Structure formats: structure tokens, C-alpha cells
């Protein structure tokens, strides 16, 4: 589970399995359906598959990965983000990128992992003035290049 996503109140989990001597396949997902006061929204679901290459031993030390991602989001009216106090964004995000990570073994069953990645995301979304009035301001499409993945995960091995 990714502790950084939990910091945004987003429950998440992932699974990873060996596919060959130096490769593993991971699948991470997140879902946030919390409702906050004053029509504040931070709703999303996310899926992120990743193929990882481990130069030495799997599940130990450095790794490189190639990831894809898809998310549906409905976020807005967040008072502590400038420009989002009265706006809601609802749409899809998809793309992919590359990942670097490091895996620390803590014992027979537990590990900690840190990852960072960069790549591309395509966003297609509708912008609304407020949740209550439902006034759509327009439909937008954006291309993004930059950080696409960051995480610190607590891992439990099932053998």
C-alpha cells in the first residue's frame, strides 16, 4: 500500500508477481469516494500496471520499470488549493512512463519501497463552476509531460 496516497485520504493496494528471473509485473489501484463538507470533492479511481526489471535479485535493491496509468477523477471546491475553491474538474487521465525505485527488505514478510517516475499523461475533462449549480464552463484536453509516479509503499509478502 502506498503511504503517500493514504496521505490524501485515498485507500489503495497493489499486487506484484514474478514473471521471469529478472522481471516482475505489478498492478496498483486506488479509489477515493469520500464526501467532504461544502461540496468539496476528491473522488477518483486509478489503475497503474507496471513491468519491472531487477538487475540483481527480485524484490531487493534497485529496479527500473515501465508503467501505464488510467484514472477517472471528480475533484474540486478544495479551499486550500489556489484556483480550485469554486471549480470542479471531472474527467479521464491516461498515459505512461518510466520508473526508478528501490526496495528495502525489513524481514521475512515486510519491506519498504520508494519509487519515482516520469512520463506522459493525457487529460480530457469538463470544468464546472460549482457543484450545486452544475454550470459547465467547457470541455478541455491537455497533454502533460513530467512526474507521473511517486510513492513510498509498505509491503507484505504472501508466500
Listing of model-derived features with the role each one plays in the protein:
Residues 144-159:
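Outer-membrane beta-barrel "beta-signal"
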Residues 8-10, 44-48, 93-97, 147-149:
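Transmembrane beta-barrel architecture of outer-membrane proteins
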Residues 1, 15, 27-29, 49, ...:
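Membrane-embedded beta-strand positions of outer-membrane beta-barrel proteins
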Residues 22-25, 59, 108-112:
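Repeated loop/turn-to-beta-strand initiation elements of outer-membrane beta-barrel proteins
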Residues 3-7, 29-35, 53-55, 68-74, ...:
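Transmembrane beta-strands of outer-membrane beta-barrel pores
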Residues 11-26, 45-55, 152-153:
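Feature captures outer-membrane beta-barrel proteins of Gram-negative bacteria and organelles
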Residues 30-44, 72-94, 123-143:
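Flexible, solvent-exposed loop segments that connect beta-strands
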Residues 40-77:
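Mid-chain, structured segments of secreted extracytoplasmic proteins
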Amino acid at each position: 500500500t502506498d503511504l503517500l496516497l493514504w496521505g490524501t485520504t485515498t485507500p489503495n493496494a497493489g499486487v506484484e508477481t514474478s514473471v521471469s528471473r529478472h522481471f516482475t509485473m505489478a498492478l496498483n489501484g486506488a479509489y477515493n469516494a469520500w464526501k467532504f463538507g461544502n461540496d468539496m470533492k476528491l473522488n477518483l479511481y486509478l489503475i497503474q500496471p507496471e513491468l519491472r526489471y531487477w538487475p540483481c535479485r527480485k524484490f531487493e535493491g534497485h529496479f527500473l520499470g515501465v508503467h501505464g496509468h488510467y484514472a477517472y477523477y471528480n475533484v474540486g471546491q478544495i479551499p486550500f488549493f489556489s484556483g480550485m475553491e469554486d471549480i470542479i474538474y471531472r474527467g479521464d487521465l491516461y498515459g505512461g512512463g518510466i520508473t526508478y525505485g528501490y526496495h528495502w527488505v525489513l524481514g521475512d514478510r515486510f519491506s519498504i519501497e520508494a519509487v519515482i517516475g516520469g512520463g506522459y499523461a493525457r487529460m480530457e475533462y469538463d470544468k464546472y463552476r460549482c457543484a450545486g449549480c452544475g454550470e459547465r464552463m467547457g470541455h478541455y484536453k491537455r497533454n502533460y509531460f513530467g512526474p507521473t509516479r511517486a510513492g513510498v509503499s509498505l509491503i507484505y509478502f504472501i508466500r
